[in-house]
Amino acid sequence: MKLQLCAVGRLRSGPERDLVEDYLARFERTGRPLGLPAVQLLELEDRKGGGMEAEADLIAKAVAPGAALVVLDERGRTLSSPEFADHLAHWRDSGRDVALAIGGADGLAPRLRDRADLAISLGRMVWPHMLVRVMLAEQLYRAATILAGSPYHRV
């Protein structure tokens, strides 16, 4: 299994990057004994200014062939953290590669959303795409702790 996080744009150094790196490192430490791979973070830049369509092309090219495509989108399913952990365990157990895709400031092109195996939402509010990375990295770590039976996730 390969786990990719494909995100449009680059995080500059600062608190958002620090948080993403911290949560992905925690995920790797917690997930490795569970058979979860380290997350491959792919920061994609549309240098030609082609908007959502060009960004969709970049994401599509970055996704491993045959990988399950999971897009973050405000119209997606709202999952609880345990439900997200169940999805992660299912992907791990099936051995299928997974690509989590975060669009740019304007979101994802409809053709990419339509192609996705799963669209998930972090709630009904719209979030800046740079913060979505932090929130998704934390949810990956949280999912690993749920699968490990750690007390990090409290309800």
From Swiss-Prot:
* Record has Methyltransferase as a keyword: yes
Q: Which GO terms describe its cellular component?
A: cytoplasm
Q: List locations, semicolon-separated.
A: Cytoplasm
UniProt-listed Pfam families: SPOUT_MTase (PF02590)
Q: Which InterPro entries match?
A: Alpha/beta_knot_MTases, RlmH-like, tRNA_m1G_MTases_N
- What SUPFAM superfamilies does the annotation carry? alpha/beta knot
Q: What is its EC number?
A: 2.1.1.177
Matching CDD domains: RlmH-like
Q: What domain of life?
A: Bacteria
Q: Which reaction does it catalyse?
A: pseudouridine(1915) in 23S rRNA + S-adenosyl-L-methionine = N(3)-methylpseudouridine(1915) in 23S rRNA + S-adenosyl-L-homocysteine + H(+)
The disulfide bridges present are: none
- Residues annotated as binding S-adenosyl-L-methionine: L72, G103, L122, G123, R124, M125, V126, W127
* UniProt keyword annotations, A-Z: Cytoplasm, Methyltransferase, rRNA processing, S-adenosyl-L-methionine, Transferase
* Alphabetized GO MF terms: rRNA (pseudouridine-N3-)-methyltransferase activity
Q: Which family does it belong to?
A: Belongs to the RNA methyltransferase RlmH family.
Q: Which NCBIfam families match?
A: PRK00103.2-2, PRK00103.2-3
Tell me which HAMAP family the record gives.
23SrRNA_methyltr_H
Q: What is the documented function of this protein?
A: Specifically methylates the pseudouridine at position 1915 (m3Psi1915) in 23S rRNA.
User: Quaternary form?
Assistant: Homodimer.
Protein name per its UniProtKB record: Ribosomal RNA large subunit methyltransferase H
